[in-house]
Amino acid sequence: MSTVVVVGTQWGDEGKGKITDYLAESAEVVARYQGGNNAGHTIIFDGNKYKLHLIPSGIFYSDKTCVIGNGMVIDPKALVKELEYIHSFGFSTSNLKISDRAHVILPYHIKLDGVEEDSRGANKIGTTRKGIGPAYMDKAARIGIRIADLLDRDEFARKLERNLAEKNMLLEKLYNTTGFELKEILDEYLALAEIIRPYVTDTSVVLNDSIDSGNRVLFEGAQGVLLDIDQGTYPYVTSSNPIAGGVTIGSGVGPTKIHQVIGVAKAYTTRVGDGPFLTELNDATGDHIREVGFEYGTTTGRPRRVGWFDSVVVRHARRVSGITGLAITKLDTLSGIETLRICTAYKYNGEIIESFPANLNLLAKCEPVYEELPGWTEDITGIRNLNDLPENARHYIERITQLTGIPMSIFSVGPDREQTVVVRGIYG
């Protein structure tokens, strides 16, 4: 029995899709447990690049069961579009299972997400405007509509009518914009429900039965620890729990069944959206890393903010997610930079801070404490063994493991599968 969770240790976009896709080859089940179509993951499969937002990375393996767990919020239109996208390349999706307890994103969630963000003015939180936050708000307020409701025509109609009365009032009276017609949404989403219906089941049964049978199960997190609603840079966060603990809530699998947590980190740091970012590079080096690493959002296309590796951030991720192994991606992007920096701590009013502050005003006043390391000029994209790395590259990632306190499990020197190097066994 072996279960592995893959989490991002930074602000998302760490390369989790690549690592998950690699590890999925040895798993029988791949599951997502939180988020929605607000985060994308890019997968290279058989030399081709695919971009997914909702469906787990393992979908391209016909012999793997792929699960969309109860902790996710699902936009049925986006889901059907993604199914059609996968089918267009000749892949089957018969191996997909969708939780009947997952919540549904509806048109009013998406519209409210946009108008609420616009109303914040200079205090925008950087939402992707996909309706994620409003859907999770309804879930917490106990007025959400779940997949099980969507498949029950009468129940869906009843709950939709109730919710539209409130949502239309908000849109029309508070935000001075138009609301929605009940019949229009009802007809469209009942049709979508019939497309989704064959995939829907109690996924907690699927997952627990698989684990109890001794199968390898891989849980795929979206976003990253610093975007976690509890442990991240609140309020500049997502509306769910990407940390490893989110697996138990978002999949219906108990904590005693989680065995390994792999934390994925870029060899530097990136962030999309607003909020403090102490190691950010607003200079030629930052521009160079952005272009070489092609640091643009999968979902939004927005240029990502780029900075040096921050060990304070990753130590925080290790602590709150119980990370047992580190996967460092995009090491090759740093080739050719003469001097590299790693943030080892923060300084506030002359005091050294080694843990990540919750107070963002305090965080914004901190200064990063850097350690400089020599870079390397060699092309490392063909490296397939840790000991074959240039001395400076090897020393760089060894220093990262020392500062974060996480043993190295994987490093990556390019986008392709064969450019993923396993240093330490994952599944045991």
Curated annotation (Swiss-Prot):
Active site: 13, 41
PROSITE patterns noted in UniProt: ADENYLOSUCCIN_SYN_1 (PS01266), ADENYLOSUCCIN_SYN_2 (PS00513)
Binding-site residues for GTP, renumbered to this chain: 12-18, 40-42, 304, 330-332, 412-414
Annotated metabolic or biological route of this protein: Purine metabolism; AMP biosynthesis via de novo pathway; AMP from IMP: step 1/2
Gene Ontology molecular function terms on file: adenylosuccinate synthase activity; GTP binding; magnesium ion binding
EC number, UniProt record: 6.3.4.4
Reactions listed under catalytic activity: IMP + L-aspartate + GTP = N(6)-(1,2-dicarboxyethyl)-AMP + GDP + phosphate + 2 H(+)
TM annotation in the entry: none
Binding sites annotated in the UniProt record for Mg(2+): 13, 40
Entry-linked InterPro entries: Adenylosuccin_syn_GTP-bd, Adenylosuccin_syn_Lys_AS, Adenylosuccinate_synth_dom1, Adenylosuccinate_synth_dom2, Adenylosuccinate_synth_dom3, Adenylosuccinate_synthetase, P-loop_NTPase
SUPFAM superfamilies: P-loop containing nucleoside triphosphate hydrolases
Alphabetized UniProt keyword annotations: Cytoplasm, GTP-binding, Ligase, Magnesium, Metal-binding, Nucleotide-binding, Purine biosynthesis
Binding note for cofactor: Binds 1 Mg(2+) ion per subunit.
Binding-site list for IMP: 13-16, 38-41, 128, 142, 223, 238, 302
Keyword Nucleotide-binding attributed: yes
SMART domains, sorted: Adenylsucc_synt
Subunit structure comment from the entry: Homodimer.
Similarity field: Belongs to the adenylosuccinate synthetase family.
Database matches in NCBIfam families: PRK01117.1, purA
Function description: Plays an important role in the de novo pathway of purine nucleotide biosynthesis. Catalyzes the first committed step in the biosynthesis of AMP from IMP.
UniProt-recorded name of the protein: Adenylosuccinate synthetase
Source organism of the structure: Brevibacillus brevis (strain 47 / JCM 6285 / NBRC 100599)
